[in-house]
Amino acid sequence: MTVTLGMPAAPPRPVGTRRLSRQIHVGNVPVGGDAPVSIQSMCTTLTSDVNATLQQIAQLTAAGCQIVRVAVPSQDDADALPTIARKSPIPIIADIHFQPKYVFAAIDAGCAAVRVNPGNIKQFDDKVGEIARAAKAAGTPIRIGVNAGSLDKRLLEKYGKATPEALVESALWEASLFEEHDFRDIKISVKHNDPVIMIQAYRLLAQACDYPLHLGVTEAGPAFQGTVKSAVAFGALLSEGIGDTIRVSLSAPPIEEIKVASAILESLGLRERKLEIVSCPSCGRAQVDVYTLANEVSAGLEGMEVPLRVAVMGCVVNGPGEAREADLGVASGNGKGQIFVRGKVIKTVPEAQIVETLIEEAMRLAEQMEADGAASGSPSVSVA
């Protein structure tokens, strides 16, 4: 039987036209221009613990991280950079605060880029020329990372607090200092913990320069709160074409940041869709435990590398219609489930066999898609 699948192999076009920015390269990852929006995270290990750091980087890479940042608060951390930069499977960005000497150590170590915070590096403006020369000689991009929590005191006095205008002025001022030394291998971030202020700042920045922009809501909070803040801010900006690389900051294991970032990009059509569950909130009409069914189907399909859409429906109101719109689906009721493949009922099974049947059919469809040369992605599961 030939099955026509509902989900397109290519993602839908993003909502807005992409902002045209200059392109830089962070290691082998292009950032800006027409390059796809890339995903970043940051290690939570002590950088001086080389083995633990490399192990976490490997886990992040497997989850889909493309660029990773490591903290360099001490000489021991700086001493670990050459080994980490050499052995990491993805580009390393050294995160530098307070001590400009670590900027030069990171460049010498072969890091793919260096993040500097102009708000807290001692005599940063006086060091820009030396940093620019070293970075240019090594081909190392610089990220000017402005943060609301460490804004230059001069700007706080001028604006009274970390306003969007203050964040942007800080970033553009530091960029202009690098430009005076003919260095433009730059990307910029202007982070705030309030997504509304953050959105306003990036909109202003996008109009004022053509540097690639790294998006982030700083100190976003625990997993749930941070996910909501990041989704709101990134969704608004990326739908307007603003943003070239993103990091979801969560008070959670960094691998969770990658999952959220990937889901945000997929939801906007900026990355091929993978595992996606669309489920109803359940109600008194549901004739099946939707929560358990959705979780079991999701767990059973986790890791499948094809863009498959599966619908798991809990009642007869929207169930049949939603299931027909999916590549694979079930409409549940009266202790049984009708299994749909691309809108056609192929069998009816007892409720106890729904999960097993869906997983079996998903595997079969995945094999067919791979045989037909479909682009890889993960399954997309819809539950209601």
Curated annotation (Swiss-Prot):
Its cofactor is [4Fe-4S] cluster. InterPro entries: Dihydropteroate_synth-like_sf (IPR011005), IspG_bac (IPR016425), IspG_bac-typ (IPR004588), NO2/SO3_Rdtase_4Fe4S_sf (IPR045854). Pathway: Isoprenoid biosynthesis; isopentenyl diphosphate biosynthesis via DXP pathway; isopentenyl diphosphate from 1-deoxy-D-xylulose 5-phosphate: step 5/6. Binds 1 [4Fe-4S] cluster. Keywords: 4Fe-4S, Iron, Iron-sulfur, Isoprene biosynthesis, Metal-binding, Oxidoreductase. It catalyses: (2E)-4-hydroxy-3-methylbut-2-enyl diphosphate + oxidized [flavodoxin] + H2O + 2 H(+) = 2-C-methyl-D-erythritol 2,4-cyclic diphosphate + reduced [flavodoxin]. It comes from the Bacteria. Transmembrane segments: none annotated. One of its GO terms (molecular function) is 4 iron, 4 sulfur cluster binding. Pfam families: GcpE (PF04551). One of its GO terms (biological process) is isopentenyl diphosphate biosynthetic process, methylerythritol 4-phosphate pathway. Its EC number is 1.17.7.3. This is 4-hydroxy-3-methylbut-2-en-1-yl diphosphate synthase (flavodoxin). It comes from Parafrankia sp. (strain EAN1pec). The gene is ispG.
